[in-house]
Structures are given as C-alpha cells and as structure tokens.
Design a protein with these regions (language model features):
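Conserved catalytic core of sirtuin-type NAD+-dependent deacylases
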Residues: 1-253
Length: 256
C-alpha cells in the first residue's frame, strides 16, 4: 500500500499523522456512510437512527439499528491498509492515527496511538436528556459510572466503572447505567452533537505539529475533521492523499 519511494521519504519523518475515513475500512466489509449506492445513508435516513432526537423519540429502533451495525463490525477484521498503517510504527518514531471510523480496527491491527474523533461503536455511554434534566426541580449531579447527569438519590453507591464496561451493544431491551439508571447508547457522535473537545484539541495539535500527514479514505466532507490536512499543509508538513477518487484537497496534495 505504501510505495517504496514514499517509504523512503517517510524515513526522515519524526512525527507522522495518519488521518483515515470510512474508505479505510471498506475492504474489511464495513459499508461507508456516504456512497450513493451502497452507503449506509443510501438505505436509511440518518435523522431516523443517528440523532439525539431519534433516540429520544424511538430509542429501541435506534438501538436495534446500531446493534445491526455492530454485528457487521464484530465480523470485520483489519485489512491490509490497517496493517500497513500499524507497520509505520516500525520506522517512524511517532505515529498518531486520527480516525473518523468507529470500528476499532486500527487498534486491532496494532496501532498504539489512535484518536477516535467520532467515538467507538464497541463502547457505551449514558443517554442524558439535558433539556428534561435541567427543566425539573431536582439538582443534577454527575454519575461517577457513566459521567452523565443524574439525580442524587438515583446513584448506586456500590456500582463501579467495571459494571458499565461489561455491558455490550447487543439485541434485546436497552440496558441502563448501573450507577444512575439512565438508558445506555453507543459512544459515537451523532448528527447534531459536537465532537469531544479534548479529542478534537489533540487531533488539531497533532496535525499542526507533525512532519507529514497521510489522508486515507476520507471524503473530506465532514467538518471540523476535514480541516486536519489543511492544518498540516499550512504548517509546512508533507501531506499525502490515498483515495480512489480526488477530493476537494487533491490539487494541493500528493495524490495516490
């Protein structure tokens, strides 16, 4: 996947960022989101399955859709691209993977430093309706198990983070946080939700301080992640794009 001449240029790099999108995992059998024919959003309206409003309106339907997606992710294995990215660690002192994917395949391939901008489908967190919570009379506190808002008298003093960690995204009724009783949901970024500020700050810092950035399989249509190659380019880094079709940045990048 990585051409020999590019490998040679990368040998002089001290900090490499690899930025990946849905195309990275397509060969592992995970459909992309935006392909007009086979993408996930070609088959279902994201407003029905990937927004806080959808979960508030029909939580079981949204949960079941994510269970179906999680089943495909669990069957998937890292492809040659994931393996090649992990091997970059053998000759580049510092490699930071920044991914828009939620499938955990970079970690499965052996990449050590992975910033997951859009979360991880294999993790769960509490769904907290902050509008409803702050509209009531109760004083909200933070549940130490799920880090969501809770009402003080709902907290279980005997529950621990390990009780949440063993709960999986699987078919059946939606589980609840063992600490505060809130419904659980996939720990992914839905439409209308902001990215984790700390995660985004780490990604920006990596892009702005790297020697080189390789962009693989991203349509570069979703902000703020799409700005990462530009941030690296504007700081003088070598930026390489590996994509089957050109993107909005292709004229400014080394395109493969």
């Amino acid at each position: 996947m990585i051409a020999p001449d590019l490998q040679e240029r990368l040998r002089a790099v001290r900090h490499l960022v690899v930025f990946t999108g849905a195309g990275m995992s397509a060969e592992s059998g995970i459909p992309t989101f935006r392909d007009p024919a086979e993408g996930l959003w070609a088959k279902v309206d994201p407003a029905d399955v990937a927004t806080p409003h959808a979960f508030r309106k029909n939580p079981q339907f949204v949960w079941d859709w994510h269970v179906h997606l999680a089943d495909a992710v669990r069957r998937a294995r890292p492809n040659d691209g994931h393996e090649a990215v992990a091997r970059l660690q053998e000759f580049v002192p510092r490699v930071t993977v920044i991914t828009q994917n939620i499938d955990n395949l970079h970690q499965a391939a052996g990449s050590q430093t992975v910033i997951e901008l859009h979360g991880n489908l294999m993790r769960l967190k509490a769904f907290v309706d902050t509008d409803e919570m702050f509209g009531g009379d109760a004083s909200p506190v933070i549940c130490r198990i799920c880090n969501g808002y809770a009402v003080d008298d709902e907290l279980d003093p005997y529950a621990g983070p390990e009780d949440l960690a063993v709960i999986e995204l699987q078919a059946g009724p939606i589980p609840r946080c063992p600490g505060c009783g809130a419904l659980l949901r996939p720990d992914v970024v839905w439409f209308g939700e902001p990215l984790d500020p700390g995660m985004l700050e780490d990604a920006f810092l990596a892009a702005e301080t790297c020697d080189a950035l390789i962009c693989i399989g991203s349509s570069l249509e979703v902000e703020p992640a799409a700005s990462l190659p530009w941030r690296a380019l504007n700081r003088g880094a070598m930026v390489v794009e590996i994509n089957p079709v050109p993107t909005s940045l292709s004229l400014s990048l080394i395109h493969i």
